[in-house]
Amino acid sequence: MPQLDTSTWFTTVLSTTITLFILMQLKISLHNFPQTPSVKSIKYMKTDNPWESKWTKIYSPLSLPLQ
């Protein structure tokens, strides 16, 4: 059984890593980022729900009189 030649693995892994790094740097550098990020104000809108204005009583089974 022939032995696996691993002498070129270091060069292959190193060149692949460098190539991926360069490609990612190019991809990031070509991306358009906003120049001045600003804070967006969040306005909460109060909605009038019909059940908020009414008083409701919830009867739990334990508070009912015994029969």
UniProtKB/Swiss-Prot annotation:
According to its UniProt entry, one GO biological process term is: proton motive force-driven ATP synthesis
InterPro entries from the UniProt entry: ATP8_mammal, ATP8_metazoa
Q: How does it sit in the membrane?
A: Single-pass membrane protein
In this UniProt entry, the residues modified to N6-succinyllysine are 54
**Cellular location(s):** Mitochondrion membrane
Q: Which residues cross the membrane?
A: 8-24
**Keyword Transport in annotation:** yes
- Keywords for this entry? Acetylation, ATP synthesis, CF(0), Hydrogen ion transport, Ion transport, Membrane, Mitochondrion, Transmembrane, Transmembrane helix, Transport
Any one annotated GO CC term: mitochondrial membrane
One term of GO molecular function: proton transmembrane transporter activity
Query: Which residue positions does N6-acetyllysine occur at?
Result: 54, 57
User: Quaternary structure?
Assistant: F-type ATPases have 2 components, CF(1) - the catalytic core - and CF(0) - the membrane proton channel. Component of an ATP synthase complex composed of ATP5PB, ATP5MC1, ATP5F1E, ATP5PD, ATP5ME, ATP5PF, ATP5MF, MT-ATP6, MT-ATP8, ATP5F1A, ATP5F1B, ATP5F1D, ATP5F1C, ATP5PO, ATP5MG, ATP5MK and ATP5MJ. Interacts with PRICKLE3.
Its biological purpose is as follows:
Mitochondrial membrane ATP synthase (F(1)F(0) ATP synthase or Complex V) produces ATP from ADP in the presence of a proton gradient across the membrane which is generated by electron transport complexes of the respiratory chain. F-type ATPases consist of two structural domains, F(1) - containing the extramembraneous catalytic core and F(0) - containing the membrane proton channel, linked together by a central stalk and a peripheral stalk. During catalysis, ATP synthesis in the catalytic domain of F(1) is coupled via a rotary mechanism of the central stalk subunits to proton translocation.
Write out the similarity annotation. Belongs to the ATPase protein 8 family.
Instruction: Quote the PANTHER family the UniProt record gives.
Output: ATP SYNTHASE PROTEIN 8
Q: What is this protein called?
A: ATP synthase protein 8
Q: Which species?
A: Microtus pennsylvanicus (Meadow vole)
